[in-house]
C-alpha cells in the first residue's frame, strides 16, 4: 500500500525502528503487558513488518497496521489499518440476510492518549476509507468497539458510519459496530 497523506498526517508502513514506539502504543491502548512482554511484542512486530512487506510483493490486500505520523514533527502518534473480520455480523439487523458469521473488511485505529481530541483518528481513518473505496473498491468497511468507548463511537459517527448495537453480550469487543457502505 502506498503512503497516504492528509493535511496533517502521513500514513505509512511501519519500519523496524518503530518497534519501541509501537510497544508503548500497545500498552497505552490495551494495558501494560496485554500483548506480552517487550521481547514478545518486538518479535510480533518484526513478523508483522516482514509479513506486510511479503503480502505487498504478492499484491495481496494491505491488511495490518500503518503508522500515523504528524507531518509537522514526524512524530509517530498512532496506528490505523485494515483487518479481515470474520465475526457474527449476522446478529445485526442490517446483516439479517447473511449467515451468522460473515467476512468483512474491518478498520481500526489507536492513538496515544495525549493525541486524543485533535481529530487525528478521524483524519487517518477517513484517508484509509477513501483509499479502500477508491483503490481497493471495497463494498463495505466496518469498525467495532465496546459500548463505553465513546471516543471511537464519535469517530465512527464523524466518518458517516451507520451504528448498530450487538443485541447479545458476546463477543465483548463486538458491542457497537460502525458500518459504511461504498456508494460510488
Label for each model-derived stretch:
Residues 86, 143-153:
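Conserved beta-strand-loop-alpha-helix junction that forms the acyl-donor binding cleft
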Residues 135-144:
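Conserved GNAT acetyl-CoA-binding A-motif
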Amino acid at each position: 500500500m502506498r503512503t497516504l497523506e492528509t493535511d496533517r498526517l502521513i500514513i505509512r508502513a511501519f519500519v523496524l525502528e518503530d518497534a519501541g514506539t509501537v510497544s508503548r502504543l500497545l500498552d497505552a491502548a490495551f494495558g501494560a503487558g496485554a500483548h506480552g512482554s517487550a521481547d514478545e511484542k518486538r518479535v510480533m512486530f518484526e513478523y508483522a513488518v516482514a509479513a506486510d512487506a511479503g503480502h505487498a510483493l504478492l499484491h495481496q490486500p494491505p491488511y495490518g497496521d500503518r503508522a500515523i505520523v504528524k507531518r509537522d514533527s514526524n512524530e509517530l502518534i498512532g496506528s490505523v489499518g485494515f483487518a479481515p473480520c470474520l465475526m457474527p455480523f449476522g446478529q445485526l439487523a442490517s446483516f439479517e440476510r447473511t449467515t451468522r458469521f460473515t467476512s468483512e473488511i474491518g478498520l481500526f485505529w489507536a492513538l496515544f492518549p495525549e493525541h486524543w481530541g485533535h481529530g487525528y483518528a478521524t483524519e487517518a481513518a477517513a484517508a484509509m476509507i477513501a483509499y479502500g473505496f477508491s483503490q481497493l473498491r471495497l463494498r463495505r468497511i466496518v469498525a467495532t468497539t465496546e459500548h463505553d468507548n465513546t471516543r471511537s463511537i464519535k469517530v465512527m459517527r464523524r466518518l458517516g458510519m451507520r451504528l448498530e448495537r450487538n443485541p447479545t453480550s458476546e463477543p465483548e469487543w463486538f458491542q457497537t459496530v460502525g458500518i459504511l457502505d461504498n456508494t460510488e
